[in-house]
Amino acid sequence: MHTNYDVCRMAELNASQLNLSDQEVLFETGEQNGIPAGIGRVGNLPEAMTLEDTARYVKERMGIPEVIVYGDAGTEVRRAAVSGGSGRSVVGSAAAKKAQVLITGDMDYHTATDAVAGGMCVIDAGHYGTEYCFIRDVAEQLRKEVPFCEIREAAVRHPYYVI
């Protein structure tokens, strides 16, 4: 279910959290009803902003306590790629689709610094930080599909803390 949800819903949910406009699939894996489907989305942020302001915007919109930022804080970004969970495999697709920043989780140092050397900033919002919105989304869908069942959502609790 996890990967299926990543393809069918997670990307559009993350893009919606960030209010991306003019969206397209980041990494196509197939199609649904003749429409491209796949991992991640790429589109435009509501307005151009610095990388530092983008990082703060991501924290606020995704409701997470911290992000790791790779790139110059003053770099202006508008075109963003987002991929929930681990985004290491979509760096090339994000660059090919002219993303100025990739917002994802589980980004390792070497991949992130290589992306920056290639001209694209990276915001690592954490695997959990980019995917915990799944809980509420699936609960809402289940409430619609099986209204005769009580659906309880697990409490949101980040699995780690930073000292």
Label every PLM stretch briefly.
Residues M1-I163:
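Hydrophobic structural segments
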